[in-house]
Amino acid sequence: MASTRPSSTATKTKAPDDLVAPVVKKPHIYYGSLEEKERERLAKGESGLLGKEGLKAGIEAGNINITSGEVFEIEEHISERQAEVLAEFERRKRARQINVSTDDSEVKACLRALGEPITLFGEGPAERRERLRNILSVVGTDALKKTKKDDEKSKKSKEEYQQTWYHEGPHSLKVARLWIANYSLPRAMKRLEEARLHKEIPETTRTSQMQELHKSLRSLNNFCSQIGDDRPISYCHFSPNSKMLATACWSGLCKLWSVPDCNLLHTLRGHNTNVGAIVFHPKSTVSLDQKDVNLASCAADGSVKLWSLDSDEPVADIEGHTVRVARVTWHPSGRFLGTTCYDRSWRLWDLEAQEEILHQEGHSMGVYDIAFHQDGSLAGTGGLDAFGRVWDLRTGRCIMFLEGHLKEIYGINFSPNGYHIATGSGDNTCKVWDLRQRRCVYTIPAHQNLVTGVKFEPIHGNFLLTGAYDNTAKIWTHPGWSPLKTLAGHEGKVMGLDISSDGQLIATCSYDRTFKLWMAE
């Protein structure tokens, strides 16, 4: 068969104009050394053809390229992108292998443990579950296990922190506890016997007596008003015989006034700053000599001073407090003195032994007020941490935790019936607690501002007195806790209050620098 291969002459046939390819001039390739050419070029440059001016002209013409030295490695950039793509691919692969709970609450808990928002706007359970899966694919499932272990460790540390621990007290503390036990048990028996006798009184007689008392309380009026100092009066307290009233002032002075005519008897000088409280000894003006210690006071600088009735100077100073002492209270026996301090503790002092026998901690913030049970067996404290505590002085244990107030507790008091406790707080309420049931039995919405003090009627506890920063004091029935009378008359905050031992007089002191006596008509 004949070959159809075209001859060489066929390539020389003339093609159409539109198919003619442009002729490309091939560059010349030179072989060998360029030394001679370079010498010629340099020789011409020395003659001025390519000198500095020629170099400058070449740069301006763009024939000579001057670079900054920056180099962009294309291969390195491509490798980084490839690494990112591979990492994302591996992450998605891990995400598909991670098992996530279908319980939405558990998914939220896991997100919270990882420090992520538990929900986003418009996010449903499925999207939330997928978001958790993506987070775990980045941080790893071990992160969730680690957070759970940390939570368990923190719980264990909290449990260890909440364990009871003890201070080793002095031998005098043991002696004092035995003494308090021997003192309180007979008084408790006497109180219970009086309660039995009171219960034997016919119901009609008791009801009529209560009605007469309520009628008398409703007729209370301002009997006397006296300007007590140039600065606000922070505290007032009746003497046991109800013939004197002690007031504490922000000027650092303590004053004694006659009752009921309100004449100034003594001015006690010794404090250099705001006095927080001054209280009479339980046996002062009754069986105690005037030269003995009849009063105790405390101030914001941590000083606690003891006073007699025949001198304007303090008899002794109780040293040991380094920060503010808010309140001071006598034990019913008169042998011990309790102080509350802003160092989150309260202390018990034995004045016969002249030493501190108990430094009790337990509050997480400063302790503001303290009260003793009339038997002498218990102490109640109210703190700025919004909690109250009841302590058994015979064993040192906290027997009741008063939890329920929303703000600081500024006042606490025991009822003469032996089982009711009242607390006043910065949340404007007064709560009544039952020692037998160990719970709050009633919450009184007492005032429109913080409650500064609470006080039970000292004989039978038939009514409750409260004072507050709304410039009023109020009287409440016991046990009904209904309002009986509002004592309005102060132009400033009511900062302190007290009821005389015979129950006939009520005293209130105020930020307006006055104290007032209230008596039934």
Swiss-Prot record:
What's the source species' lineage?
Answer: Eukaryota, Metazoa, Chordata, Craniata, Vertebrata
Q: Which domain of life is it from?
A: Eukaryota
Q: What is the recorded function of this protein according to its Swiss-Prot or TrEMBL entry?
A: Plays a role in pre-mRNA splicing as component of the U4/U6-U5 tri-snRNP complex that is involved in spliceosome assembly, and as component of the precatalytic spliceosome (spliceosome B complex).
From the Swiss-Prot or TrEMBL record, state where the protein is found: Nucleus; Nucleus speckle
Q: Which InterPro entries match?
A: G-protein_beta_WD-40_rep, PRP4-like, PRP4-like_sf, WD40/YVTN_repeat-like_dom_sf, WD40_repeat_CS, WD40_repeat_dom_sf, WD40_rpt
Q: Which SUPFAM superfamilies match?
A: PRP4-like (SSF158230), WD40 repeat-like (SSF50978)
Q: What is its main location?
A: nucleus
Residues modified as N6-acetyllysine are: 26
Q: Which PROSITE patterns match?
A: WD_REPEATS_1, WD_REPEATS_2, WD_REPEATS_REGION
A cellular component term from Gene Ontology for this protein is: U4/U6 snRNP
Q: How does it assemble?
A: Component of the precatalytic spliceosome (spliceosome B complex). Component of the U4/U6-U5 tri-snRNP complex, a building block of the precatalytic spliceosome (spliceosome B complex). The U4/U6-U5 tri-snRNP complex is composed of the U4, U6 and U5 snRNAs and at least PRPF3, PRPF4, PRPF6, PRPF8, PRPF31, SNRNP200, TXNL4A, SNRNP40, SNRPB, SNRPD1, SNRPD2, SNRPD3, SNRPE, SNRPF, SNRPG, DDX23, CD2BP2, PPIH, SNU13, EFTUD2, SART1 and USP39, plus LSM2, LSM3, LSM4, LSM5, LSM6, LSM7 and LSM8. Interacts directly with PRPF18, PPIH and PRPF3.
Q: Start-end of the WD repeats?
A: 229-268, 271-318, 321-360, 363-402, 405-444, 447-487, 490-521
Task: Give this protein's Gene Ontology molecular function annotations.
Answer: U4 snRNA binding; U6 snRNA binding
Q: Which GO terms describe its biological process?
A: mRNA splicing, via spliceosome
Name of this chain's protein? U4/U6 small nuclear ribonucleoprotein Prp4
Query: Which UniProt keywords are present, listed alphabetically?
Result: Acetylation, mRNA processing, mRNA splicing, Nucleus, Repeat, Spliceosome, WD repeat
